[in-house]
């Protein structure tokens, strides 16, 4: 039986002709039978693709041959092309949508003026030395099933909400404290940390490689607790059998890490449900009434 894998990677680097890169990436994925999502902009690439292991390896090798993408940090996980409904390769103003393409400055070394990168072991050293504030760089719902202990979780539905959230003043008291931003694979914090630095946060760090790299090293024996939300059919993954379940069913409060869409076709709001509540259309509905109904 063929072995399948999913890869996640990004690169912030000047791309002179994003449309040409889009055509090349699509042709490369089609050649190797891969599916997934790839975004390309003048500032780089953001990709998650899956397929047969040998095909994914060939794709990664070819992608790394492009000068701007020589040094991409490729994160591997279990999964396959079946975890993605199709192949999507698009050119966008941003490879991660903060709604601030004019604020981001990128050169051949990556994002200019971002937070200091920390390897997982360096994060532990920093935590031992200072009173660190963890700042979640993901959508708020992702933190319902997993986050760093005692992390600040901004009230954002999408990454586009972060600028208004930062400009609201509610985090100004943190501007003189050491802040470690983190996200799934590191890309959102590349942008978020630079936005925070520009807004006067004096000591900003970012977890290099994101939660994925941290989890690979420390599993569930470190500062992370819970499951990691992922944007494909898997919905979430765990780093070990010792993973703690911190999510709660929106209907009954039972422990769960499983997200489901509301059964109301006019709503479809994504919420946490335990297996029992998800099994019936009567309980697979928003507990407080559907906001879209």
Swiss-Prot record:
GO BP term, pick one: tRNA modification
Active site: 183
SMART domains: RHOD (SM00450)
Rhodanese domain sequence ranges: 128-223
Domain of life: Bacteria
UniProt-listed Enzyme Commission number(s): 1.14.-.-
EC category name: oxidoreductase
PROSITE patterns given in the database record: RHODANESE_3 (PS50206)
Cystine bridges: none
Keywords annotated in UniProt: Oxidoreductase, tRNA processing
Catalytic activity: uridine(34) in tRNA + AH2 + O2 = 5-hydroxyuridine(34) in tRNA + A + H2O
GO molecular function: oxidoreductase activity, acting on paired donors, with incorporation or reduction of molecular oxygen
Family: Belongs to the TrhO family.
Role: Catalyzes oxygen-dependent 5-hydroxyuridine (ho5U) modification at position 34 in tRNAs.
Protein name: tRNA uridine(34) hydroxylase
Organism: Renibacterium salmoninarum (strain ATCC 33209 / DSM 20767 / JCM 11484 / NBRC 15589 / NCIMB 2235)
Gene name in the database record: trhO
């Amino acid at each position: 039986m063929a072995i399948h894998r999913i890869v996640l990677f990004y690169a912030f680097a000047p791309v002179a002709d994003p449309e040409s890169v889009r055509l090349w990436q699509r042709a490369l994925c089609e050649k190797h039978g891969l599916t997934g999502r790839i975004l390309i902009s003048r500032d780089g690439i953001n990709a998650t693709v899956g397929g047969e292991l040998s095909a994914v390896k060939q794709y990664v090798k070819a992608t790394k041959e492009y000068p701007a993408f020589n040094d991409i940090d490729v994160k591997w996980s279990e999964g396959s092309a079946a975890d993605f409904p199709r192949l999507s390769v698009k050119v966008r103003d941003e490879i991660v949508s903060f709604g601030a393409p004019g604020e981001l400055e990128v050169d051949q070394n990556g994002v200019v003026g971002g937070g200091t990168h920390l390897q997982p072991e360096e994060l532990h050293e920093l935590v031992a030395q200072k009173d660190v504030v963890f700042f979640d760089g993901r959508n708020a719902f992702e933190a319902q099933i997993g986050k760093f202990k005692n992390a600040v979780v901004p009230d954002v539905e999408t990454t586009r909400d972060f600028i208004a959230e930062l400009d609201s003043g509610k985090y100004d008291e943190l501007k003189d404290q050491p802040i470690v931003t983190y996200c799934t694979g590191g890309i959102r914090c590349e942008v978020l940390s630079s936005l925070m630095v520009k807004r006067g946060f004096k000591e900003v760090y970012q977890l290099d490689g994101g939660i994925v790299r941290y989890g690979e090293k420390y599993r569930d024996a470190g500062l992370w607790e819970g499951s990691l939300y992922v944007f494909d059919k898997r919905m979430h993954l765990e780093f070990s059998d010792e993973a703690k379940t911190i999510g709660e069913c929106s209907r009954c409060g039972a422990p769960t890490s499983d997200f489901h869409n509301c059964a109301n076709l006019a709503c479809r709001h994504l919420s946490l449900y335990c297996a029992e509540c998800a099994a019936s259309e009567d309980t697979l509905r928003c507990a407080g009434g559907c906001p879209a109904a």
